[in-house]
């Protein structure tokens, strides 16, 4: 995908997600979500959507610092607070998105989410 196509798709994805819409429409059928630090992998559009919703339910005071795009890839940098441990240090993270044929095909989340991930039960991993 060209950079402008990638940028538009990522903007549309976050727009729908921010409006609490059906953001899984942007996923390939066999999309994957991997929590690198915890070794958790979730596969499939519905399962990934459910996992992302559950993960966001454990996050508060979310700050997006930067979104960078290139041909067929995007990277989001941010930080948040674990709602279960509000006195803990902020969690810095980076999510890398792979895109092809106007769909998100894979997402990899880098950060120290170990404690938060243990509170989430993926629907299909």
Residue ranges and their predicted role:
Residues 1-26:
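Short acidic-aromatic low-complexity motifs
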Residues 2, 49-125:
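A beta-strand edge to alpha-helix "cap/lid" segment located at domain peripheries
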Residues 7-11, 31-39, 92:
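Short N-terminal signal/transit or membrane-insertion segments
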Residues 15-17, 41, 83, 102:
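A generic signature of intrinsically disordered, low-complexity regions enriched in glycine/proline
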Residues 20-72:
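A solvent-exposed, acidic/Ser-Thr-rich amphipathic alpha-helical stretch
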